[in-house]
């Protein structure tokens, strides 16, 4: 089965083709440089850029893949959560394409796709603990199957990735700040600054990073007054050691918090021997190291995709669509988009006859 995946939930316009679980080709247009001028994503500009590039990117993808449009069996698209205007561009394009080709149509949960992205590189193993850490979400899931994920904990205010970007902005780092903060942290010492580990004085599995963000911002205002470095800072070369140390301490506080909650979830679910790490913050080198060590100590395994599959991409949408499509799942063309802040409805339909036919081929 050939599945086209379309991703337009935020500021990346991306399309990919997955055939029988294998990535054939992917194309992407990023808006990072444009939004960096404003210090964050401007929703109206994001949706206009998606509209501008989605058609040409589809044409480019099909040329590279040496596939014809008529060979597409399933069109999968990120339906949410995300920015409403951005989602609408991708969903409208996907619906029109599926209708014109007579292909099946499927709306994919953007968060679920992140959790499944590692399957493009290595076998996914279940049941597993899913730790999704991105700019908009910090969630824990009990994953019984690729399409059966039980929420265990969620972000109550600022997500980890959002905290990285906002503190990076206070520090004068180029947007988005998370990647550069990771690099700066690698050259700093974390033991000189005692940032709090937020929301650990309870027995639940939810996250809250607003207090840590405020603590870091206050520290910068109190200790970095009068200090100068190039702004926006785009590399580690011109950064003073004090800045590197601050990034190291903040980075460690975030990672400690994530790993503490993950450990708590594993202790309560001892049958979970695998941990799937996903989302843009899964690119963080310290987080990848600590999660790997955590699972090794417990005799389990950490499943972590390559950094190129952690950030928003269409390969994960196409792969999630293929996994669901081969089980016979699909949506009707009146499916709605679901912006951030709303729960995705369980409205997929299933054609069991199609799934049985597919399993025999």
Curated annotation (Swiss-Prot):
GO terms for molecular function: iron ion binding; N(6)-L-threonylcarbamoyladenine synthase activity. Substrate binds at residues 132-136, 165, 178, 182, 284. GO terms for biological process: tRNA threonylcarbamoyladenosine modification. It is an enzyme of class 2 (transferase). Binds 1 Fe(2+) ion per subunit. Its main location: cytoplasm. Pfam families: TsaD (PF00814). GO terms for cellular component: cytoplasm. It is found in: Cytoplasm. Signal peptide: none annotated. The keyword Iron applies. Disulfide bonds: none annotated. It catalyses: L-threonylcarbamoyladenylate + adenosine(37) in tRNA = N(6)-L-threonylcarbamoyladenosine(37) in tRNA + AMP + H(+). Its EC number is 2.3.1.234. Its cofactor is Fe(2+). Coiled coil: none annotated. Keywords: Acyltransferase, Cytoplasm, Iron, Metal-binding, Transferase, tRNA processing. Fe cation binds at residues 110, 114, 312. It comes from the Bacteria. Required for the formation of a threonylcarbamoyl group on adenosine at position 37 (t(6)A37) in tRNAs that read codons beginning with adenine. Is involved in the transfer of the threonylcarbamoyl moiety of threonylcarbamoyl-AMP (TC-AMP) to the N6 group of A37, together with TsaE and TsaB. TsaD likely plays a direct catalytic role in this reaction. NCBIfam families: gcp_kae1, T6A_TsaD_YgjD. Belongs to the KAE1 / TsaD family. This is tRNA N6-adenosine threonylcarbamoyltransferase. The lineage of its organism: Bacteria, Pseudomonadati, Thermodesulfobacteriota, Desulfovibrionia, Desulfovibrionales.
């Amino acid at each position: 089965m050939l599945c086209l995946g379309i991703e337009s939930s935020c500021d990346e316009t991306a399309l990919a083709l997955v055939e029988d679980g294998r990535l054939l080709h992917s194309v992407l247009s990023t808006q990072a440089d444009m939004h960096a001028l404003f210090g964050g994503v401007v929703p109206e500009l994001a949706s206009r850029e998606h509209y501008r590039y989605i058609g040409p990117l589809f044409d480019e993808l099909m040329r590279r893949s040496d596939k014809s449009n008529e060979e597409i069996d399933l069109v999968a698209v990120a339906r949410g959560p995300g920015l409403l205007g951005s989602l609408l561009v991708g969903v409208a394009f996907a619906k029109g394409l599926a209708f014109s080709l007579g292909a099946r149509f499927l709306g994919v949960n953007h968060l679920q796709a992140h959790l499944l992205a590692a399957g493009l590189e290595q076998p996914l193993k279940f049941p597993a603990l899913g730790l999704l850490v991105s700019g908009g979400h910090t969630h824990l899931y009990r994953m019984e199957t690729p399409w059966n994920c039980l929420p265990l904990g969620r972000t109550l205010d600022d997500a980890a990735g959002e905290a990285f970007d906002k503190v990076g902005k206070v520090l004068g780092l180029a947007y988005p700040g998370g990647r550069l903060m990771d690099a700066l942290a690698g050259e700093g010492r974390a033991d000189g600054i005692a940032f709090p580990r937020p929301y650990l004085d309870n027995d639940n599995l939810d996250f809250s990073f607003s207090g840590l963000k405020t603590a870091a911002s206050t520290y910068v205002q109190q200790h970095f007054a009068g200090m100068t470095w190039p702004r926006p800072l785009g590399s580690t070369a011109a950064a003073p050691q004090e800045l590197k140390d601050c990034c190291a301490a903040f980075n460690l506080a975030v990672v400690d918090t994530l790993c503490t909650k993950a450990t708590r979830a594993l202790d309560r679910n001892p049958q979970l021997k695998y941990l799937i790490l996903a989302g843009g913050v899964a690119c963080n080198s310290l987080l990848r190291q600590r999660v790997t060590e955590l699972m090794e100590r417990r005799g389990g395994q950490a499943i972590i995709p390559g950094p190129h599959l952690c950030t928003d991409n269409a390969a994960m949408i196409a792969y999630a669509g293929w996994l669901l499509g081969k089980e016979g799942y699909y949506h009707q063309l009146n499916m709605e988009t679901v912006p951030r802040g709303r729960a995705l409805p369980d409205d997929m339909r299933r054609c069991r006859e199609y799934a049985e036919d597919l399993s025999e081929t």
